[in-house]
Amino acid sequence: MITIDGSMGEGGGQILRTALALSIITGKPFRIINIRARRSNPGLQPQHLASVMAAARISNAKVDGAYKGSLSLTFEPGDVKCGDYSIDIGTAGSISLVLQTLLPVLAVVNCGEVTLDITGGTDVPKAPPIDYVRFVLAHNLSLMGVGIKVELIRRGHYPRGGGKVKVTVKPAGRLKPINITELGELKGIWGLSHAVRLPSHVAVRQAKAAEDYLSKLGLKPSISLEYYEQGKDPHLGPGSGITLWAESTNGQRIGADSLGERGKPAEDVGREAAEALAAVINAGAAFDDHMGDMLIPFLALAEGRSEYTVVNLTSHLSTNISIVKLFLNANIETMNYNKKVKVTINPITAPRKP
C-alpha cells in the first residue's frame, strides 16, 4: 500500500484529491497521514470528505478514517461503478475542488457519458471559481479529447453555499498529449463579472476595472455581466466575482479570477483578475499557474510525451508531480525556459481499471 505524508509540499487538500483520482484509475490503495497537518484547521473538512465519499461511491472503495478532523485515511478502491451521480457537499465547500478528484477518473474510465449533479460552493475562497472550470479547464481538457459540459444552475458563495452545477463528462478513452511551450497570438480576451444578492453596479464596476487595466496594455476584453433584479434573484448569496480568459491561436486558454468579499472595493476585484491575466500574457507562458498543476495527472495518463510552460514553479505544481510519481511510473521534469518554467511529462502507461 502506498503511504503518503499529507504535510508534504503545499500540504493541503490537493494531495488527497490527486491521490484519490489516481488510486481509482490504477487500482492502487493508499494511506495518507498528517492530512492538512500544518493548516489552522487540520484534518479532513467537509469539502474533503465530499471528495472522499464521491470517490468511494464511484469505485466501491473501502475507506477508513473518513470523518471531520481526521488526520489519516485509508482508501482501497474496488471496481468502477459507472452511472450518473448526485453529490451534496453540504456546505459552501468548493464544487470545483471535488471535480478535481472526479474529472481525471471520468476522463479515462470506460463508462461512456456520465452526469454529475453537485450542490455546494461555486465561488468560494481558495478554490477555482466554477467559471474557470466552465471556460478554461473544460476547454483545455477538450484538447486532450475529453468532452466536458458544465451547466451552472445556481451560484453558491461562502458561507451559505447552495450552488448547483450539472457536469456532463464524455471520456477520451486515450488522452492526447499537449505540446505547447509558448502562449502564441491571442484570438481574444473574454470575461464574466457576476454579482448575486448585491446591486448590479458591483458587477459593472468589477468589469470596468478589468477592462480599464487591460486596455492600458493594448488589450480589448469582452466582459459579460451577470446580475439579477431585486426579488428575482434565485441565489442565497450575497457574493460577487470575475473570471477572465484568453484563447491563443495555439488552441489553449489561460485564465485568471478574483472573488469579491465584504469591504473589498469592486474595482480591486476586477483589477486583481486583470493583473493576474496580464502577468501570464507578459510572460508568454502557455498556461496560467493554476492550470499548470491541474494538467499534471491528466498528462501523466496521456498517450505520449507532453511539454508546456507556466510562469512559476508553484508548490502546488511540485506537490502534484510528487503524488503522480507515487502512483504512475511517469518521468516528469521541470526546468527554466526563456524566463518561464517548462514541464515535460513522459508517461509510462499504468494499468487502468475497466
UniProtKB/Swiss-Prot annotation:
Name the Gene3D superfamilies on file: RNA 3'-terminal phosphate cyclase domain (3.65.10.20), RNA 3'-terminal phosphate cyclase, insert domain (3.30.360.20)
User: Taking the first listed entry, what is the main subcellular location of this protein, grouped into a coarse class?
Assistant: cytoplasm
Q: Name one GO cellular component term.
A: cytoplasm
Catalytic activity reported: a 3'-end 3'-phospho-ribonucleotide-RNA + ATP = a 3'-end 2',3'-cyclophospho-ribonucleotide-RNA + AMP + diphosphate
Q: What is its EC number?
A: 6.5.1.4
GO terms (molecular function) for this protein are: ATP binding; RNA-3'-phosphate cyclase activity
Among the record's GO biological process terms, what is one? RNA processing
- Entry keyword annotation includes NADP: no
Query: Where located?
Result: Cytoplasm
What Pfam families is this protein classified in? Answer: RTC, RTC_insert
Keyword annotations for this protein, in alphabetical order, are: ATP-binding, Cytoplasm, Ligase, Nucleotide-binding
Q: Which SUPFAM superfamilies match?
A: EPT/RTPC-like, RNA 3'-terminal phosphate cyclase, RPTC, insert domain
Q: Which residues bind ATP?
A: Q100, H290, M291, G292, D293
Family matches, as CDD domains: RNA_Cyclase_Class_II
**From what superkingdom does this record's organism come?**
Archaea
- UniProt-annotated catalytic positions: H316 (tele-amp-histidine intermediate)
| HAMAP family per the UniProt record, alphabetical | RTC (MF_00200)
Q: What NCBIfam families is this protein classified in?
A: PRK04204.1-2, RNA_3prim_cycl
Its biological purpose: Catalyzes the conversion of 3'-phosphate to a 2',3'-cyclic phosphodiester at the end of RNA. The mechanism of action of the enzyme occurs in 3 steps: (A) adenylation of the enzyme by ATP; (B) transfer of adenylate to an RNA-N3'P to produce RNA-N3'PP5'A; (C) and attack of the adjacent 2'-hydroxyl on the 3'-phosphorus in the diester linkage to produce the cyclic end product. The biological role of this enzyme is unknown but it is likely to function in some aspects of cellular RNA processing.
Q: Which family is this protein grouped under?
A: Belongs to the RNA 3'-terminal cyclase family. Type 1 subfamily.
Name of this chain's protein: RNA 3'-terminal phosphate cyclase
Organism from which the protein derives: Caldivirga maquilingensis (strain ATCC 700844 / DSM 13496 / JCM 10307 / IC-167)
